[in-house]
């Protein structure tokens, strides 16, 4: 005889077996034990929490109860204002010393040589040369010197020579 098809279906949906009182009590005890284990470990605040993470090189863990060692002022202290030091200005050179520095300036000489050779300078270089040449002119006027001193002397000598020739000396 063939088993009926209804029996095969009932095997899959068979009722769950009822638990005994002892099994129910054991499960309740397990749940209670799990519930007690929730949360942080006892004393975790005083112990410093997890010691595994953090500093690797230190042997003794740092006690979190110990605070900062920086002193705290207890009274009202007057504010100490820091005095700003003025930017040190370049030492003032005498006009003669400054003129000598400008005349021996290698960059200025190189740029002037390039100008004499017919090269065109960049705008930045040209403005720098103009500023330096203007400063040289100012210093020479201050000192009572001029570029044309040598040329004037030569012209004066030529005129004197001409005068001598005309006089017949």
Swiss-Prot record:
Where is composition skewed (Basic and acidic residues) in this entry?
20-30, 160-169
Give the Basic residues compositional bias ranges: 10-19, 31-40
**Acidic residues bias located where?**
147-159
| InterPro entries for the chain | YihI (IPR007336)
Record key words, sorted: GTPase activation, Ribosome biogenesis
Describe its function: A GTPase-activating protein (GAP) that modifies Der/EngA GTPase function. May play a role in ribosome biogenesis.
Binding partners and assembly: Interacts with Der.
Family (UniProt): Belongs to the YihI family.
Q: What is this protein called?
A: Der GTPase-activating protein YihI
């Amino acid at each position: 005889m063939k088993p009926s098809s209804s029996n095969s279906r009932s095997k899959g949906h068979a009722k769950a077996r009822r638990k005994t009182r002892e099994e129910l009590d054991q499960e309740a005890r397990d749940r209670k034990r799990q519930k007690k284990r929730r949360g942080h470990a006892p004393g975790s605040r005083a112990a410093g929490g997890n010691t595994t993470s953090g500093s690797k090189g230190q042997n003794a863990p740092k006690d979190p109860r110990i605070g900062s060692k920086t002193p705290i002022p207890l009274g009202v202290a007057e504010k100490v204002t820091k005095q700003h030091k003025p930017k040190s200005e370049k030492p003032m050179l005498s006009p003669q010393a400054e003129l000598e520095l400008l005349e021996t300036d290698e960059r200025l000489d190189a740029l002037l040589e390039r100008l004499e050779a017919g090269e065109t300078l960049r705008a930045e270089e040209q403005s720098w040369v103009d500023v330096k040449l203007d400063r040289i002119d100012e210093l020479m006027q201050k000192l009572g010197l001029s570029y044309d001193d040598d040329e004037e002397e030569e012209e004066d000598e030529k005129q004197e020579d001409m005068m001598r020739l005309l006089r017949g000396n």
